[in-house]
């Protein structure tokens, strides 16, 4: 028989497209993937944080801003520094979000493997939007990514979905279309499942 808290979680999770966010108060790692302009920062603020405020987000842009104090400028060692900060943070057992374009596969493998050794649950959330929308939004950001980099990242993300799923084996791999209203999908056993009512089919 379910306890009251288990019953509440089960009922709530039926209506929540990513129930892990609410379920885990500690030791949940989210690898948040998406192009520049896909809306990663907005998704954290609008979707993740309202469901569970116990997350610390790590992004290269944030580290760069700490050093340059100017969002339009990029600090060359930001990516390395971001990974080192996150690597230290996971030893605390607190929830984290690794906000990344997915262009550095080695960093993703490192963080997931280190987290697993410390008992973390890992999920991937990949934000998807059409290339034109991403490029338009990118121009509206404080720091614009080069279009060549956006094209490169777009090709890598689509290629790496099976790589991450097969080799890193996250508990769940979600896809979220952020072009307009959020639409949720799940990548499972090599197939993309659509969300219908309270389940993915």
What are these regions (language model features)?
Residues 41-95:
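Conserved substrate/cofactor phosphate-moiety recognition/catalytic segment
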Residues 77-122:
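Glycine-rich phosphate-binding loop used to anchor ATP phosphates in small-molecule kinases
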Residues 20-27, 89-90:
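Phosphate-binding P-loop
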Residues 118-137:
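Conserved phosphate-donor/acceptor-positioning beta-strand/loop module used by diverse small-molecule
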Residues 1-12:
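Short acidic, low-complexity intrinsically disordered linear motifs used
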Residues 11-23:
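Pre-Walker A adenine-sensing motif
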Residues 28-36, 57-58:
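Short, hydrophobic/glycine-enriched beta-strand segments
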Residues 33, 38, 52, 132-201:
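Conserved GTP-binding G-domain of TRAFAC-class P-loop NTPases and closely related GTPase folds
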């Amino acid at each position: 028989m379910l306890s009251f808290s288990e019953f509440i979680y089960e009922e709530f999770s039926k209506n929540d497209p990513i129930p892990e966010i609410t379920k885990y108060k500690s030791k949940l790692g989210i690898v948040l993937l998406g192009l520049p302009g896909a809306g990663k920062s907005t998704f954290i603020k609008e979707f993740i944080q309202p469901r569970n405020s116990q997350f610390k987000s790590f992004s290269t842009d944030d580290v760069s801003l700490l050093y340059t104090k100017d969002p339009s400028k990029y600090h060359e060692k930001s990516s390395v520094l971001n990974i080192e900060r996150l690597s230290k943070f996971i030893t605390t057992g607190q929830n984290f979000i690794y906000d990344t374009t997915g262009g550095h596969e080695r960093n993703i493998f490192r963080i997931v493997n280190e987290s697993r050794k410390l008992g973390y649950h890992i999920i991937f959330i990949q934000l998807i939007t059409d290339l034109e929308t991403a490029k338009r939004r990118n121009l509206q950001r404080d720091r614009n990514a080069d279009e060549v980099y956006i094209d490169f990242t777009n090709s890598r993300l689509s290629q790496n979905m099976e790589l991450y799923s097969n080799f890193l084996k996250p508990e769940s791999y979600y896809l979220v279309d952020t072009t307009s209203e959020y639409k949720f999908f799940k990548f499972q056993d090599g197939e993309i499942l659509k969300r219908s009512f309270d389940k993915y089919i």
